[in-house]
Structure formats: C-alpha cells, structure tokens
Amino acid sequence: MPQMMPLPWIMVFLVSMALLWAIMTMVFFLYQPRSVSSAKGFSDRTVYLNWKW
C-alpha cells in the first residue's frame, strides 16, 4: 500500500466500505433468527457501530 494515497482512491475505498457495510446490515436484517428480539439486535448493531468507528 503506498504511503501517500491519492484522494480519489481514498474516496473509492470509503464508498466501497460503506456499500459493503450496508449490504452486511441488509443481510443481517433479512436473515437474523426471528427468536432474537429486535431490541437486542439493535443494541448489538449499536455496539458494533461504535466499535467499528
């Protein structure tokens, strides 16, 4: 990885990461077990979001 990354490459990277996170969130919403309460799922997502950023 180059030491000085060009701005367009950084923007493409950020956009790709945002899209990947959105896809993962959609998959989590669609395929999460129904036995898990929505409150617990929301708490887990909040903790994960705070840890990620």
Swiss-Prot record:
GO CC annotations, alphabetized: mitochondrial membrane; proton-transporting ATP synthase complex
Cellular localization per UniProt: Mitochondrion membrane
Listed GO biological process terms: ATP biosynthetic process; proton transmembrane transport
Main location: mitochondrion
Topological type in the membrane: Single-pass membrane protein
Record's keyword annotation contains Membrane: yes
Membrane-spanning residues: 10-30
Keywords associated with the record: ATP synthesis, CF(0), Hydrogen ion transport, Ion transport, Membrane, Mitochondrion, Transmembrane, Transmembrane helix, Transport
Keyword Ion transport in record: yes
Role played: Mitochondrial membrane ATP synthase (F(1)F(0) ATP synthase or Complex V) produces ATP from ADP in the presence of a proton gradient across the membrane which is generated by electron transport complexes of the respiratory chain. F-type ATPases consist of two structural domains, F(1) - containing the extramembraneous catalytic core and F(0) - containing the membrane proton channel, linked together by a central stalk and a peripheral stalk. During catalysis, ATP synthesis in the catalytic domain of F(1) is coupled via a rotary mechanism of the central stalk subunits to proton translocation.
Assembly notes: F-type ATPases have 2 components, CF(1) - the catalytic core - and CF(0) - the membrane proton channel.
Family (UniProt): Belongs to the ATPase protein 8 family.
Protein name per Swiss-Prot or TrEMBL: ATP synthase protein 8
Species of origin: Artemia franciscana (Brine shrimp)
Gene giving rise to this polypeptide: MT-ATP8
